[in-house]
Amino acid sequence: MHKDPYIFAQLVKFLDRSKFNRIVTKYEGDKYIKSYTCWNQLLTMMFGQLSNRDSLRDLIVAMEAHAGKLYHLEIGKSVTRSNLSKANEQRNYRIFEEYATFMIAEARKRRINKIFELDGHVYAFDSTTIDLCLSVFEWAKFRKHKGGIKLHTLYDIEAEVPAFVHITPANIHDSKAMPEIPYESGAHYIFDRGYNDFSNLNTINRIGAFFLVRAKTNVRIKPKTWKRRLPEGVVSDVIGCFTVYKSSKDYPEELRKLIIENPEDGTRYIFLTNNLDASAEFISSLYRNRWSVELFFKWIKQHLRIKKFWGTSENAVRIQIYCAIITYCLVAIVQHDMKLERSVYEILQILGISLTDKTHLSDLFDKSNFKNVKDRYDSSEPNLFNF
C-alpha cells in the first residue's frame, strides 16, 4: 500500500501558502467566497499547467476524472467550468501577479550561479508577442485584423529565471516598457536593437548601472579616444559622444561603440555601452548570453499553457500567464532543492504523467527511466536548466 502523498500534493508543499494568503487578504480576494478560494483556484490552474490541459473544458474533465482524489491532491473541492471561468474573469489578477513576483524572488535566491564573477546581477530584457484571436479577445486589438499582448521580461541570466515581468498590449513599442524595469546600481542590462532609447539608457547610466545595447546601423559617434590594437574579431572600439542633436540631448555623456565581427559568417554587430573599461571579449560574452531570454520565451510558449487561453477577458489572460510563471518558478525551485540532474523539460514531462501517482518525488526522478521522454526531446529546443 502506498503511503506517500500524491505527486501534486508534494509539489504544493514547496509553495508558501501563508504568503499567498496575505496577498489574498490584501486584495480581499476571498471576500464573500464560501468554498472555492483563490488558493483552490491557483492549484487548479497549476494542475492544468502541469498536466498540459489545452482548454478550460479539458481541465474540468481531468478534474472530474480525479474527483475522489482532489482533497488528497491538496486542490480541495471540485469546481464547475462556469465557476472556474467566473473566478478567472472576476478575481483580481494582481493576487497572482504579486505571488508570481514572490516566486520569482524565491527562485532567484536559490539559483545564484556566478557566470561572470561580477558584483552586480546580469540581466537581459526583451519581449515576446502572444497572438490572440481578435474576434474573441476584442480588448487586445493589435492590428486591423489581429489581436495580441506582449510579455516583457527582465531575465536573470545567472539564475536562469525571470526577475521581472510586465504585460502590455502588443502595439506598445518595446522601449516603452524600459521605464518599468526595477533598475539596480552595479547591474548589467543587455538589450537588442528595439531598445535604442537613449533617454532610458541615460537613466541606467545615472544610477550607476551598466547597459549593453545592440545599436542600429545608422548610429553616429564622434570619437574622442579609440583603441588601435584590437583583438581578433573586433573591427572598431571607440569612446565618444553622439553627433545627432536628439541623441546627444537624450544621452549627453560619453559612451563606447564597438563593432564586432562574427568569425563564422562575417556578420558585424554594433554595440553601445557605458562600460568604458571592460574588454571587448567580455562585452561580446555578455551579448551572447542575451540569447537565454529568447530560449525562455520559446520554452514557456512551448511547454506551458499560454498559447491557448482558458478565458477571454484581460483579467483571465493575465491570471493564466502569472500562473504559468508561478509554475515555472516552482519547477525551478524543486529542481534546485532536490538537486535534480534532469532538465526542467524532462521534469515537466515526468510530472505531466505522474501528478496523481503515489510515490516520493525523489523516487520518481531517481527510479524513472523515461527513455521515451528523451527520445521525444528535441535537442534544438531550449534547455535552460540542464547544468
Segments from the language model and where they lie:
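Short alpha-helical linear motifs
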Residues: 82-86, 107-110, 368-374
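Single, function-defining residue in the core of a domain
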Residues: 1-58, 91, 99-102, 117-121, ...
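Catalytic micro-motifs at enzyme active sites that drive phosphoryl/nucleotidyl and oxygen chemistry
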Residues: 72, 111-112, 139-142, 178
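DNA-recognition alpha helix
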Residues: 55-73
